[in-house]
């Protein structure tokens, strides 16, 4: 899917400058960003390069995530909103390409977005596989059934757990060591439920 946006154009310009500054990373940055057609395709390629395993190679995971993204309503806008929110809220984030390439919180939420779409299309096993790999690699555990709006920032993120009963609205910041959602069951029903409103911040 070909997409054109101000953010995507800025990302490509930033990555070209990164290559000029660090030529040894040219192949890495070219393959994962400059050869891609949109924020979603670049995000899928970067995630796949991180969470590949003996079970599924990078190309296979890339295809699964891209396929999931095609089923997600407004996925480009959601990923773009996440990047925008990072740039606004994190003083250390001066470029859109920084969370895309290097922030595990952004990549964990982006993996969740693919898993959530798969979950909603009854592909629970693949959704849980993506959840598990993201938890192992990024240290952020987000259940595919959770509901997360656009414009969410998980900063640092180590030890963040977002359960299946969680609802997170737009423009919410979450830091490390935070658990949200059900922690137990009573007669088959969750006994805890978390709803983070817009503009909330959750810290350990």
Could you say what each language-model-derived stretch is?
Residues 118-128, 133-140, 144-145, 153-154, ...:
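Glycine- and small hydrophobic-enriched segments that form the cores of compact globular domains
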Residues 194-201:
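Conserved small/polar residues in nucleotide/adenosyl-binding loops
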Residues 1-133:
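Terminal amphipathic alpha-helical/low-complexity segments used for targeting or macromolecular assembly
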Residues 184-186:
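Short glycine/acidic-rich loop motifs that flank beta-strands on beta-rich extracellular proteins
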Residues 142, 148-150, 154-156, 162, ...:
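Hydrophobic face of beta-strands forming the core of extended beta-sheets/solenoids
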Residues 121, 170-171:
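Secondary-structure boundary elements
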């Amino acid at each position: 899917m070909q997409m054109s946006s101000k953010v995507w154009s800025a990302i490509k310009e930033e990555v070209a400058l990164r290559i000029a500054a660090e030529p040894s990373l040219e192949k890495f940055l070219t393959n994962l960003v400059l050869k891609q057609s949109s924020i979603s395709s670049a995000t899928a390629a970067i995630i796949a390069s991180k969470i590949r395993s003996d079970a599924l190679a990078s190309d296979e995971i890339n295809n699964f995530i891209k396929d999931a993204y095609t089923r997600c309503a407004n996925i480009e806008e959601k990923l773009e909103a996440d990047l925008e929110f990072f740039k606004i809220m994190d003083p250390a984030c001066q470029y859109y390409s920084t969370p895309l390439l290097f922030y595990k919180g952004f990549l964990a939420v982006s993996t969740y977005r693919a898993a959530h779409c798969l979950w909603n299309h009854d592909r629970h096993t693949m959704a849980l596989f993506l959840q598990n790999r993201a938890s192992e690699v990024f240290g952020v555990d987000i259940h595919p059934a959770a509901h997360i709006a656009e414009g969410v920032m998980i900063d640092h993120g180590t030890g963040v757990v977002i359960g299946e009963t969680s609802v997170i609205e737009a423009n919410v910041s979450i830091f490390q060591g935070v658990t949200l959602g059900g922690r137990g069951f009573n007669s088959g029903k969750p006994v805890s439920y978390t709803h983070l409103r817009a503009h909330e911040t959750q810290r350990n």
